Amino acid sequence: ILPITPAFQEEEKYDTFLLKNGYCGAFLMGLALHDSWIKQLENTTMPTVLFDNFISGNPNVCYLGTDSYEGITMAVNHLVNLGHKNIAFLNGSLYSLVSDQRQEAFESAMAAASLPVQKDLTAYGYYVSDSAKYHVPGFLSAGATAVVCGNDLIAKGVIDECTKRGFRVPEDVSVVGFDDISIAATFDPPLTTIRQERNELGRCAYDILNSLIHHIPISKTLLRPKLIERESTARCAHRD
């Protein structure tokens, strides 16, 4: 397991790095769309499983992930079914394939429910809980009764910021996370979230990489998400 920074990617070519270190393949995660290695993966000859990013037309690279589009659609539909109309979205990072997919899913799910996507109710949280303090005040001022979050850490920050400002979760504001990390059930209140099956992702990554090493091309594998209903969502109180 090796951390690969943007600066390192500029200094070291992807194929060269793997070959000189004796690696026969790699599982890559956390790359942004503008990262140097993403471009290089279009032509790599090294078996590569790419988590949450997609490279088309290269049989040596497979895109593995959870269906983010379906996951965000589940989250929005859950809130709509609870009567929420002013739904905010605190997404992940800019320049991310997954964030782009989730933004598209959020807008489509809202449109399907005949609900507008308000510009002041969408923002990027870069997957850190601290981001909530910069965006939640604006969401609350704009009348949000629910917040869909790019991951569970953002959701924890949203809950904390709502509580700090005198808004109860879920009585005043419902919050939905994404991932279902191990501590999500211990949040106060326990977090309603979209589960990614991490163990299954790991098993799939190994199996796919083994297939690629043996020249069996697999272009894309998406796992199904699951809505985990806990106590951070409730029927809308129709707060103005």
Locate the predicted segments by residue.
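Anion (oxyanion) recognition and catalysis
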Residues: 42, 111, 163
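Glycine-rich phosphate/diphosphate-binding loops that line cofactor/substrate pockets in enzymes
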Residues: 76-87
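Alpha-helical recognition/docking segments in bacterial nutrient-uptake
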Residues: 1-77, 139-142
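Short acidic/polar active-site loop segments enriched in Thr and Asp
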Residues: 24, 85-86, 145
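Hydrophobic/aromatic beta-strand patches that form the interior of the parallel beta-sheet core
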Residues: 27, 49, 62-64, 88-90, ...
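A short acidic, amphipathic alpha-helical/loop segment
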Residues: 13-14, 36-41, 105, 135, ...
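Flexible loop/turn connectors
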Residues: 117, 135-240
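Hinge/beta->alpha junction and helix N-cap segments in small-molecule ligand-binding domains
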Residues: 2-11, 64-74, 90-135, 148-156, ...
